[in-house]
């Protein structure tokens, strides 16, 4: 940056300096510009100004240039004297130079002003928004300048529980903005973000797309990608004017009419999944459409009209129609341009129509009723095929599909897999839950990087593999799942040096010595076995994730050198001594529940821990945790704590990152000290001995609160917890629930087995999807008729008549209502 100053040059009548150019400040002035003579009297000084640029040399000080430092003129030489009136051109030059210098001075001042303005600190109007921005940009408490904001092109503010985003107007350079999973209905602040190309506004409970919303969206001339999923929208008529959109996501809404979309002819990708759409005639003009997701819309029957329309979409390459209760797909045989087709989770048994789709690269038929796959042999271009969970026993038709790279066959009745031996391009293969005993055919699949032989799930008979020597040839294998496979000898794997992930859980093994050679492992799952000794793990220094849960381990000293571990599950063992863990400073997640632990001092050095589960032990002193400032989740439930001391609270308050705390099952009666843990978002106090919950009124950031199984009768303190999403108050002594009428964000509420008779306070809780009122004294359920979002409602063991229950069922057709009624129909 240059700072401009001025130096005054005066006529003194002295002899010029012996050089052709005269230096003023740090600028050289040519002889003909500096040769200013005396006027007619030879005395009057006429200064003019020359801009000097700071930072260009040692002399760039911007000081006035005096006659002592700069001399111009030629004293006594009358022949060179001039009068301004006699030399107008020379005078004009002088004036022009002076004007230029003045302009440079003004520009310099403006640059300084603009520089200061551009560095102005940004002041936010909404604290929640500022906090969310700082978290997204990882700025903590640093000064945030306007210049910083203008450099930001992508911003993720998802899940910050925001409602006011007016401050977003300053982020004028944004091209990508994610405001999903908030409570934002007003987006007027986006109007000037004309560089925005992608906007994710999903999961905001919008309900209605109004004219104001569309006006803002239309102003975003460059907007190409819009996500409005999970918003309970039913009417999308206003979207028809957003003609520049190329990608539109409308999944998980209540849409049935999509006629407004016919004008958005630039659309290339459209997601309509999980709605109630049967008529797709509006799509016929969307000739640029390449991807269409029409899954989970309960279509039932694919009729000729559907197929005629889909055929007209000449550029359509990807079609998703999963979970639609479809049984007949004969009409789909004409969609010969398709490259990817998903028909999973339907009721399809006959797939002969697919034989014409020879351009298919990807086909998903999982979760159907298919037994005959002969027609698939025609689909020579297939690279990905999913046939999981059907009724297939013969896979001979697959042997010619040599382009396959991914093949999923789990959950069928396959016993012979010789056809797979020809598929040498396979990289991913799943064969779990079949009737396979011989896997020798796999030895030729040397390109395999991922193999799944997991078993004993979903109640199926399962494989019976004893010999896995064929796997010894698969030297590129990186991931192997043997969970529940009844394979106890894995010595054949000793040469698989690329193996980084092994799941050997649920196998009833006790000896793991064969693991000593697999030193490349990064993820190892040995859960639900009969392991007591783990010395073989001592050399597994590359391990990052280790699951040893549900075994017979009491000595964990072999783990002390596994310093790369980030996730460790030792739950449900017989461990009491934790000293081997004290050097595992990379640990982020540690599960120690259901052991014999009393002393946790060894955990004091694990400063990277974010999640710690100590439940079902005998830990009463948590002072060792005081330095674990990254801890966000602590489960200290069922440890016979009894009393929450000031020391405990002091430790917990020091854990400034902690958001989730579980103190359930601890026989606690006094929770007054917990009122200071104002950062908590989730608190579980179920099954204690609590009667006074007044201290909880301060925890206004709570989203989840569990108080079931206590002695609570007064819940007035809960009226302040307006951010709650989930509340459990079952098995208490509650009669009055008026305090709940302010908790309009509640989605899940459990009040079973209390003494509640009047439920009128619930009438405004329109966000509820789960409500449990069983085991109370309720006789009138009229207050529930407006809760149109209810999906699960439990009313057992109340004083309801059959008529009242039936009337409620008519009012809430979408809800599954579990109830019984008294014999009196009055």
Feature map (PLM): residue ranges:
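Generic detector of contiguous secondary-structure segments
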Residues: 1-17, 119-120, 187, 196, ...
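Concave beta-strand-loop units of leucine-rich repeat
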Residues: 154-163, 173, 179-183, 195, ...
